[in-house]
Amino acid sequence: MTVKFNVEVPCEDLKAPELGHGGYEGLRPRNETLLKGSVTAPGRRVLSCDILVEHDVPITMRDGCKLYADIYRPTNAPERSVPAILCWSPFGKKFNGIDSLKLMTPWNLGIPEGTLSGLEKFEAPDPAEWVDRGYAIINVDSRGAFDSEGVMAIMGTQEAEDGYDTIEWLAKLPWCNGSVGMAGNSHLAIIMWFVAALQPPSLKAIAPWEGCGDLYREQFARGGIYGGDLFDHLIIKYMLRGRNGMESFKKMFQQHPLANEWWNDKRPDMKKINIPTYITGTYTNTMHGMGAIRGWLEVNSPDKWLRWHPYQEWYDLWGNQEGRAELLNFFDRYLKGIENDWESTPRVRMSVLRYGEKEPIANVVEEDFPLPRTNYRKAYLTADGALSLDQPAPTSGSVSYNSEDSRDLATFTYKFTERTQIVGMPKAVLYMRNDDFDD
């Protein structure tokens, strides 16, 4: 690794890649053409065009480390004509959306059979859709993932430099038109903040759909409590595979629970991002919401959009046809230079969840975010478990819960007397004192 810190970075082992796990086929560099009208398996999306697939393409980083990618692109396209969409993550470039939905969600998230081809990487766009529109999809196994060399470093400067090197390598390939974008959600969105902040010359646009903006404060140490259960018990256990181990968030928190140089390296400087950016966020995911908001507030480009939607993130990526069409139009504008009136897309759209109603209110066009017309109200916690708009007189009382029982809660209730919309960034100011300890 080329990136060094003033603190020792603890590592942990990963399970080695296993044939068949997460679609892993072993390291088998080869080219093949998938034919129009074919399917990768029964019930999957029918390919609408021929697709050239380059498997296990090596990409050498600035420190000599070699990463591997699968490239899906149009057959017989003229030289220098195809823009590239980079999809970056450690989950396995052949671990597809169909298998991931079966592993982690009920009822396929409501995404109809035949929507996905099985070529799509987990949390990434489907090559079956994008190649037919004249794009190449590049699915990379990041540093340390599967057969890619090195120690896995999740986010931070090391991964950002790897992304930079990959983008500039892609832009020089004979089929590429020199324009590279990044797409995907969750992990694939988070890494975009880091890579784009380094300003690779050939990175022309990004679409971070649901991307956390600070791994320490928004994920692993939120509220000062270790929050890595999802990462430790699902992602590491079932999804990550590699041969050289990975940086350990859990061990780092045990050794350094307060922010240090390494933790701060997991927070991208979004103010250095200066390219067109299409951001999404949602109420359904508490991990990524603040990253989407901070991205909207801090990205230093006049060409930025925020769509706050009411769906689960993977449904929005794969099942929301309107959203997919918008994403194609966004990249048509900034990777192909097509004058398609994308700029008339509303800069800010919000959604409102309606209690007791099946359908949310979506795509509410707003001037800005936070909403300029917001009426900010203070609500006070009371000793009898209420939220009061009037500051209560000082009194003593208690509301308690069992912190060892995940089902137990301390609740404070406010009853609305008129129809009200809550859109924005609520915050709590809490005054604390511990009489038994010197804290």
Feature-to-residue mapping (PLM):
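Active-site-proximal cap/loop segments of hydrolase catalytic domains
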Residues: S38-E343, R347-M350, A362
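Catalytic-loop region of hydrolases
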Residues: T2-C87, K93, L387-S400, E404-D408
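C-terminal, loop-rich substrate-recognition/catalytic regions characterized by aromatic stacking residues
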Residues: T2-P29, H309, D316-D439
